[in-house]
Swiss-Prot record:
Belongs to the terpene synthase family. Mg(2+) 1 binds at D298, D302. It comes from Pogostemon cablin. Mg(2+) 3 binds at N443, E451. It is an enzyme of class 4 (lyase). It catalyses: (2E,6E)-farnesyl diphosphate = (-)-germacrene D + diphosphate. Binds 3 Mg(2+) ions per subunit. A motif (DDXXD motif) lies at residues 298-302. This is Germacrene D synthase 1.
Length: 545
């Protein structure tokens, strides 16, 4: 086919809906501003919390509740050393406490907090709460809820936690309508994808702060600090979002490339899920810009480009040179020039940091995702249907998560994202393969009907259905089991001893948490529903009163 003969009617257009935000984020007009006196108050509150945490060291349950509240309220990053010390103290007492106390709430809370911190404490502590083969003794609702939360830390082979998950979920669903607030809200959130382990930290904090306030026994200094800190970070995030929105608007990509998804706000929200803390501002900026590129690539390969054009673009990415520009169709020249410009900006940051080596890994990350997109385009062109194993090898690359994880390291501090960290991710260890499978399957499980509206390659659901001669419902159920298996593998890989420090591993864990939001019931990046809009508004528009 001559490139000049390619018409709009021959392109597999997806007709994505436009940006839902208009110019809402074009100007930074913070509803909350922190005065010098409030910054001083933050420091005073931090000192008060430190004192309280230290005083609680001799009271097991009190210390547990303090650590849990700090984490759930979203201020753990302010007390990393203190929490490390507190959890070491709790670990030393864990076995004896669980042996001497028949307290489901404290046992489950201890187990979850210690597992979250990487300590491989035994799940046998729950055996004494069993009631029959699959049942558990029902205690107060908070104890059952905490056991439900603890089950999200399970790994392969922990049958007691598999049984506890089913039991506690069913029990909480059965009594939810009879509960009153604030416990009703907490149960609702846990049952609807916002568990402590799998929820995005910023969403969790935003949801938990008002719940915590409703409990009469809340710690006043903690609550005040959590509100102040949330609003301060919200103002910072909105300022970052405004700068990125202006960058995106000035590029005029949705006008120049009208077939793409215009999702700058959703992209920023996605990447803030990787890291929300102030020290990761540069890393967020880089990741958002690269994910904007990846989104354009995805739409070009999936919903616009003719196969010969896509082959030219892949070759140009492989060669990575300005000399490739004239060989591309006009619309692809726009994309390729943007790639070079974004990477030139990244290079300038890396030179200042003395980490120029990271640029090679970032380029490699782009080549990986383009390779995945191209292989899928080739299958589509040849009307080839791969087997499940072959599909997953390619589709885990085209899910773009390996690319995003690699790029998430690029703007981090020098002593954290070492060459060894990049090489480790590229070697695809257990936690990476599990994360990539989770990303691919989560996407496929919610995107199948939309994809059927145009020429597409079969998804994991259809391939599994065909290979195993089962119904669509059975295939979906089995693939959901696969996503649970992936979470177990992620949990196991995060238990000590670990290969790399927490800041590296947290990027991978957080990348998985983002999937729980974007691929819950539908593909919320493609179809931005009201629930996602409300979440984004709570995080970037409305401060906590």
């Amino acid at each position: 086919m001559d490139l000049n003969e390619i018409t709009s009617s021959s392109r597999p257009l997806a007709n994505y809906h436009p940006n839902v935000w208009g110019d809402r984020f074009l100007l930074h007009e913070p509803e909350f501003t922190c005065q010098a006196g409030e910054k001083q108050l933050v420091e005073e509150l931090k000192e008060e919390v430190r004192r309280e945490l230290k005083e609680a060291s001799n009271d097991y349950l009190r210390q547990l509740k303090m650590v849990d509240a700090i984490q759930r309220l979203g201020i753990e990053y302010l007390f990393e050393e203190e929490i490390d010390e507190a959890l070491r103290n709790l670990l030393a007492k864990f076995e004896n406490y669980c042996k001497d106390n028949h307290d489901m709430y404290a046992t489950a809370l201890s187990f979850r907090l210690l597992r979250q911190h990487g300590y491989k404490v035994s799940c046998e502590v729950f055996d004494k709460f069993k009631d029959g083969e699959d049942g558990f003794k029902v205690e107060e609702v908070m104890a059952v809820l905490e056991l439900f939360e603890a089950t999200h830390m399970r790994i392969h082979g922990e049958d007691v936690l598999d049984q506890a998950f089913v039991f506690t979920r069913n029990y909480l669903q059965s009594i939810h309508a009879t509960l009153s607030n604030p416990i009703a809200k907490q149960v609702h959130n846990a049952l609807n994808g916002y568990s402590c382990r799998r929820g995005m930290p910023r969403i969790e904090a935003r949801k938990y702060i008002p719940i915590y306030e409703e409990y009469g026994c809340h710690h006043k200094a903690l609550l005040k600090l959590a509100k102040l800190d949330f609003n301060l970070l919200q103002s910072m995030h909105k300022r970052e979002l405004t700068q990125l929105y202006r960058w995106w608007k000035d590029l005029e990509m949705p006008t120049k490339l009208p077939y793409i998804r215009d999702r700058l706000v959703e992209t920023y929200f996605w990447d803030m899920g990787f890291y929300f803390e102030p020290q990761y501002a540069l890393a967020r900026n880089i990741l958002v810009k690269v994910q904007c590129l990846v989104s354009i690539f995805d739409d070009t390969f999936d919903a616009y480009g003719a196969f010969k054009e896509l082959q030219l673009f892949k070759d140009a990415i492989d060669r990575w040179s300005i000399s490739c520009l004239d060989e591309l169709p006009e619309y692809m020249q726009i994309i390729y020039k943007l790639v070079l410009d974004v990477f030139e900006e990244i290079e300038s940051h890396m030179i200042k940091q003395g980490t120029s080596y990271r640029l090679d890994y970032a380029r490699e990350a782009i080549k990986i995702v383009i390779g995945g997109y191209f292989d899928e385009a080739k299958w589509r062109e040849e009307e080839y249907k791969p087997r499940m194993e072959e599909y997953m090898k390619v589709a885990t690359k085209s899910a773009a998560y390996l690319t995003l994880i690699i790029v998430s390291f690029v703007g981090m501090k020098n002593d954290i994202a070492t060459p060894q960290a990049f090489q480790w991710v590229l070697s695809e260890p257990q936690i990476i393969t599990a994360s990539l499978a989770l990303a691919r399957l989560s996407n496929d499980l919610v995107g199948i009907e939309f994809e059927k509206e145009r020429k597409y390659i079969a998804t994991a659901v259809e391939l599994y259905e065909e290979e195993h001669k089962v119904s669509k419902e059975e295939a979906v159920l089995e693939l959901r089991h696969e996503t649970e298996s992936a979470w177990k593998e992620i949990n196991e890989a995060l238990l000590e001893p670990t290969t790399f420090a927490t800041p590296i591993l947290d990027r991978i864990l957080n990348s998985a948490r983002v999937l729980e939001v974007f691929y819950d019931k539908t593909d919320r990046y493609t179809h931005v529903d009201l629930e996602l809009q409300n979440i984004i508004a709570q995080l970037y528009i409305h401060p906590i009163p």
